[in-house]
């Protein structure tokens, strides 16, 4: 029987469960695979209009994949896996600009291209947040800067005027002095790929639930795991002791 394939999703829970041995304690025979740091971030440099939904179309390999709940719903309805409805998560996110940017308020983003992941949480959450300030024709989105870590690099390099970030890149931008103009926190759903044993799925999420409790109690013990998914070239700049817990799993039905 094939091993249960686990890929972390830029969050802490999978790393904590791995460190504490929770997956093995639940009886999972699994393989743990990381793809962002391993590719130097290139996996997120997908080009224009290639985001979470397109990655589902291409075929993600892990048995459990995560994306914003909008994208997971659409992917499942189009035959790209199925949605797991016993858990969801909430990811703090925001639109960041340089410290010296003339953009001070959300209204100042009128006509400014905001870098987001195409058909991803950052895409929909940006529109949702800015609708309170701007007319539809004033909201400008840039899909060409790629997915999460690729967008982060554009912000740091000064080649993108405004970027939507979440998870580790969110905290890294804060640490480096970039300003958050508006919050864009969004929900994340879970997609099941292939036909994993239902008991393996239950074991996997039981392990993550234990990890979530650990993070809730002492997040500062685990924020160093963000480094495991950052390209090595950023490590010397990172002070993860200042970072927060990020995405939080909610073990309630998604309806």
Question: What label would you give each PLM region?
Answer:
Residues 198-255:
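Secondary-structure end/capping motifs
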Residues 12, 89-99, 174-212, 245:
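Periplasmic-binding protein-like
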Residues 112, 129, 133, 154, ...:
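Structured segments of extracytoplasmic/periplasmic soluble domains
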Residues 32, 141-143:
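A structural preference for short, hydrophobic beta-strand core positions in alpha/beta folds
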Residues 52-55, 148-155:
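Short, hydrophobic alpha-helical packing/hinge segments within bilobed ligand-binding/sensory domains
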Residues 1-136, 161-167, 180-181:
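Short, glycine-/small- and polar/acidic-enriched structural segments
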Residues 136, 143-152, 165-174:
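Active-site glycine-rich loop that binds ribose-phosphate moieties when present
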């Amino acid at each position: 029987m094939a091993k249960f394939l686990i890929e972390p999703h830029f969050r802490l829970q999978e790393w904590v469960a791995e460190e504490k041995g929770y997956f093995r304690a639940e009886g999972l025979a699994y393989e743990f695979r990381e793809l962002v740091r391993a590719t130097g971030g290139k996996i997120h440099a997908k080009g224009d209009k290639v985001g979470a939904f397109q990655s589902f179309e291409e075929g993600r390999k892990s048995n459990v994949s995560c994306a914003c709940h909008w994208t997971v719903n659409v992917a499942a309805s189009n035959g790209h896996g199925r949605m797991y409805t016993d858990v969801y998560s909430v990811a703090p996110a925001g639109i960041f600009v340089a410290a010296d940017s003339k953009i001070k308020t959300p209204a100042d983003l009128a006509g400014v291209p905001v870098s987001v992941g195409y058909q991803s949480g950052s895409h929909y959450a940006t529109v949702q947040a800015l609708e309170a300030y701007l007319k539809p024709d004033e909201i400008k989105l840039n899909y060409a800067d790629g997915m999460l870590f690729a967008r982060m690099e554009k912000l740091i390099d000064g080649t993108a005027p405004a970027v939507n970030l979440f998870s580790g890149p969110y905290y890294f931008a804060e640490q480096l002095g970039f300003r958050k103009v508006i919050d864009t926190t969004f929900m994340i759903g879970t997609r099941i790929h292939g036909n994993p044993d239902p008991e393996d799925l239950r074991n996997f999420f039981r392990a993550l639930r234990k990890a979530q409790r650990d993070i809730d109690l002492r997040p500062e013990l685990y924020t160093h795991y963000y480094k495991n998914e950052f390209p090595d070239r950023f490590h010397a700049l990172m002070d993860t002791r200042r970072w927060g817990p990020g995405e939080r799993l909610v073990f309630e039905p998604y309806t």
